[in-house]
Regions:
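Active-site anion-handling motifs in enzyme catalytic cores
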Residues: 1-345
Length: 345
């Protein structure tokens, strides 16, 4: 049995937690080490091949670092390799510390532009890993000259939610409030007002609503509260906050028929669940993936149009043009793991 270290964002973010679970379930005969602590372990406790640090492991790790005794398994050392899995991990200034050879990068995307110095560092880092599979074509094309670089649809297109399609009712709205999600505070305010206006119209038309928070750490729940303070009857709106129980959260999401998706993975999970999806775009990572998918439905691209109303968003919902057959994308997303399959299977 091989032992692998997982380098991932462990802050009870639904998308990132599902990355880790999908990875561990794909390789049940591999033992994975993941440094997630406290409540951030909750999503992984029932996954038998995921090794999580206990209190003693954390103390030992801290002590070894303080005494200069070097790294240990929960740093990725002494194992058979490292899997770095995540989306927006190659930002300008990222550490690019992909240690624990052989190292496999799964599912990242590039920024639109890098400084020449950082681009040079990133290219060298990519040369040194066993493989890197980007989740969009544009990111791949920046480094397509490297033989170990490929691309395939996002990992979560292949996620098995273990939920049959059900004809839901009403609208689920995935919210974000992360610093930097919108280019300025003014656009963030326009966003909040547009969502609140939509909610008010839905209340008046008796359309069921559910606000969705994918990650409290990044401020999604703050935006939920901000929206609720701007509607006349907030008690009539259901709220789902992800706290480390992906099964329950996805089941509640599945009860909706349309997903208005600001979170990147709300778009993909909405399609995985067979829903009508209306994307709200605040980043080029979204526009790239939507283009790769051939999505032709209505969306609010906040990168191009700063204004939006609840009335327009509701028209987008009612157009029922946001569904996408993802069968081929699901199949192709498995290529994210091609190099790792060869190494582990």
């Amino acid at each position: 049995m091989k032992r692998m270290y997982i380098q991932a964002y462990c802050q009870s973010n639904l998308g990132d937690d599902l990355f880790v679970l999908h990875l561990a379930r794909r390789y049940p005969e591999t033992e994975f080490y993941l440094y997630a602590v406290g409540d951030n372990q909750k999503a992984f406790l029932s996954q038998s091949n995921l090794r999580l640090p206990r209190a003693w492991d954390r103390l030992r790790r801290k002590g070894r670092h303080m005494l200069g005794l070097g790294a240990e398994p929960f740093d990725g050392q002494g194992l058979d390799g490292t899997v770095v899995i995540g989306g927006s991990i190659l930002w300008e200034g990222a550490s690019l510390d992909f240690s624990g050879a052989p190292c496999f990068l799964i599912g990242p995307n590039c920024e639109t532009e890098y400084s020449p110095a950082f681009r040079q560092r990133l290219e060298q880092a990519l040369r040194n890993v066993r493989s890197c599979c980007f989740r969009d074509r544009a990111s791949f094309e920046q480094f397509s000259q490297l033989p170990n670089v490929t691309w395939a649809p996002d990992v979560l297109f292949g996620y098995d939610a273990a939920l049959p399609y059900q004809r839901g009712c009403g609208i689920g709205i995935s919210l974000v409030s992360r610093k930097g999600a919108f280019r300025d505070d003014g656009l963030r305010e326009i966003y909040c007002n547009a969502i609140a206006d939509l909610c008010q119209r839905c209340l008046e038309e008796k359309i069921p609503l559910r606000l969705l928070s994918f990650c409290d750490t990044e401020g999604d729940e703050e935006m939920v509260e901000a929206v609720l303070t701007r509607v006349s009857n907030p008690a009539s709106i259901a709220v789902s906050c992800y706290r480390g129980d992906p099964g329950t959260f996805l089941a509640e999401m599945n009860e909706c028929e349309t997903i208005i998706a600001t979170r990147f993975h709300a778009v993909i999970l909405g399609w995985v669940l067979g829903k009508n999806v209306v994307p709200i775009v605040y980043s080029t990572k979204q526009t790239r993936v939507l283009a790769d998918c051939g999505f032709q439905g209505p969306m609010w691209n906040a990168l191009e149009a700063a204004s939006m109303t609840g009335e327009t968003l509701l028209e987008y919902v009612k157009s029922e043009r946001g569904r996408l057959d993802i069968a081929e994308l699901k199949k192709r997303s498995g290529a994210q793991f091609a190099a790792l399959d060869e190494y582990l299977k």
